[in-house]
Each structure stands twice: as C-alpha cells, then as structure tokens.
Amino acid sequence: MNSEFQSLPPETQEAVKRTMDTMEPAQTPAEIRETLEGTQKGGVKNSIRNCLTVFQRDPLFRGALRLNLLTEQIDIVKPLGWERTSTTLTDMDMNYLLLYLEENYGLTSEKKVQSAIKIVANENRYHPVRDYLNSLQWDGTERIRYALHHFLGADTDEYTYEALKLFLMGAIRRVFRPGSKFEVMLCLVGGQGAGKSTFFRLLAGRDEWFSDDLKKLDDENVYRKLQGHWIIERSEMIATANAKSIEEIKSFLSRQKETYKVPYETHPADRLRQCVFGGTTNRQDFLPRDRTGNRRFLPVTVYPERAEVHILDDEAAARAYIEQMWAEAMTVYRSGKYKLSFSMEMNRYLNAHQQDFMQEDTQAGMIYAYLEDYTGDRVCSKQLYEEALGNLNSPADWETRAICEIMNTGIAGGIIQGWAAYKSPKRYKKYGSQKGWERVNQAPPEGDGFQEITEEEARQMELPF
C-alpha cells in the first residue's frame, strides 16, 4: 500500500483490508479477459456482468469502489494510478476508468460501466462514522460529565451532564439506526470566542463530518446540505426566530427523513436522517416564549474564564479527549441502558431552567392588560389581534395560533384567570361567527364571605361619631 492509502483514516484502511481479504484471488487482465462473455464476432460483450467481473477481479479495482452510507456517494478508497484530489468518484475518474476498460478489455459502454460501478460499490458499502465509533476503546475514565466544563467552563451539575449525554446518545443512535426519532438540540450559550462552534466541530470526529452551512430552512437545497454530515451547527437560529419560524424549526428538528432525488437519479428516495443539530448563540434570551413547550432545546451556559483549557490551545489533545468521550458513550450505547429523552424529574428542571433563557413575552402582557379593562363577556382571536395588539390587517394563521396559545396556556404557563374557551362558534357584530373565550365566574370564597372578629378588634374599628 502506498502513501495515498496510508493517508486514509485508520478505520477506513482496516475496512478496505477486510474487504479485500474476503474477495476472490486477483487475476491479470489477460486471465480475466478469457472469462468474459463474448460476441458472435469474437469481441467482448458490452454487458453489466462483464464489467462487474472486471471490477471484482482486476487487482487495480478490487476493493477500490465503495458506497459511503453517510454521504450516499461512491468513494475510491485506494490508489488507481492517476492523481486524485477527492475520495469521491468524480467525472475525471470516470474518464480514466472508461479508458482503462476500453484499452484492456474492449468494454466501451459508459452506461453499462456506470451500472456495474453502482452494483460493486453497493456490495462493498461501508459507513465511516460507524467504523470510527466501533474502532474506539474506552480507557475507563469518565469524561462526558466534565467535558463542557473542561473546555467551555460550563457547570458540572447533573443537568449539564445529562444534556450532553443525551446529545451524544442521539448522535450515535442516528448513525447506527438512521431515521431514529431524536428531536433534541444542545444549545451552547455564551460570548464570542468561547469555543462553542469549535466544540461541535471537534465533536464530529472528522471535519468533513461537520457542517455549519445550514443557513435557511426554506432553502430548496437544505436537505442536500444534511447529506454526508453527522454534527450540524446552527448559529443564532433560534435567537432570531419569530413565532412563525420557531414552528418551522421545531417541525424541521422533528423530521426523521427527507424525500428527494439527487442529480442524475431517476426516482426520489427516502433519506433517513443520520445527523443531529447543535445550536450556538451569544444571546442569553435566545428562546422564544413558546407556550407549547421548548423541550427540544437544551440550553447550557458556558463561561470560558472558568474553563480548564481552551479547546484550541492544543487541538490534538482536545481531539483525543473527545475521542475518549465517544468511546465512553459507545460503552453506554452497547449496554442498551439509555433513553433518548429526559426523565420526568429532569424535564421539570428543564422547564424551570429554560425560563432564564426566554425572551420577554410582550404580546401576552398586552392581551392581559386589555382583558383587565375589557367589560364584555366574550372575546375572539381576531378581536384581540386588532384591539389588544393594535394591528389593522388580518392575522396570519400562525399569529392566530399564537393568540390562542396565550389565552389557553396563559402567562408563565397558567390559564388567564377569568376566561375559558367555548366550544361552538358565536356571532360577533364586527367579526362574524368566531370561536373564542367567554368570561367565567371566579370561584366564590369558602363560607359566607364574612370573617369573625374579636370584641377588641371591633372596638378598634368603631367609627368616631
């Protein structure tokens, strides 16, 4: 094996060696040519089978073409005799392959060659992240509990440990069982220069398995930007979200697959998700006050001045630490003793903890103030949109939902006192038939409403006339 092969990751080298050990003995082009199906005129038949035979037996190609299950592209994992700058099969590689097959075997059908390449690559498929994780050996030292403090100065409490462990287990589960339900985003909160983005980049193991290029969720190419990546950072995604976009973010995080076709494919296919998402923000109040719950977002504040080391002080040492962290996580994964969710107790803590990161809820305050002075017996969402919030246009669907959430779940999670939703639509003079809320009677005090007092208290309360 030459220097090009030696430059491959160790786990990839081992996978290539194992694949080649299971193959039939290599043959020379002359020997292989004798086994190929011929034409009536004595030539070599341009068939997929003949092309497959060459790719499986020619020493140049044996073990070279592999389908990468992370990128869903075909990789060339060993030298083929020409200069290459990418591990992925390129158009230039195809030109060299076609030239070699034409000169040595008389095979000239590009379509047949491409079909054979896809078949042989699929038979030799591999997953680089799985190979990486399976190659790790844990040294027994606990690191997950202390990693965020070690590099970023975060607290060492149980919540910080559970948040990072949950994120790691979700990432492992996604590569070993693509499409697994996991909708949690670990969010690192702190000032610039703390190393938040670097932490996620090094956490990916290889830089090519990391991406911070997912800028817009409505980009038509957004799904292709997930392909081939394991850890994806979203910087300031939530902090700049409004009520409408936060619903889009939550929906996006909840998806388990994408259905699309890549260029040159004839049929769209389901692409099961293999990635997880990490968030970074400089803003403390980055969470919208979402009354339906922010359970997907796990905020952890970082304090770089308290960190034991800056993550970029010694990148090699940081990578070694993180590699052992993954080895520890793999030990938990293999044991099967984990869940991809928080316990009820930790969820209660999360709900309280998130209050420190929530934005001011101005709309709820405006509606509450309006209702305090309102003398009518019922209200509808459109009325509140215009009269309480001061809007002149018609509300969008997401704005109507936001008002309904305020009325139904109230401020700080409690129903706005004195109002309850009615089931059947009622007619409003200005707004027509609408669902809404009606004033309800407050529960009367216990007893007759009078308080017994002593004779001394009565004398003190006597009027001076």
Walk through the language-model features, giving the residues of each.
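Conserved catalytic/switch belt of AAA+ P-loop NTPases
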Residues: 246-269
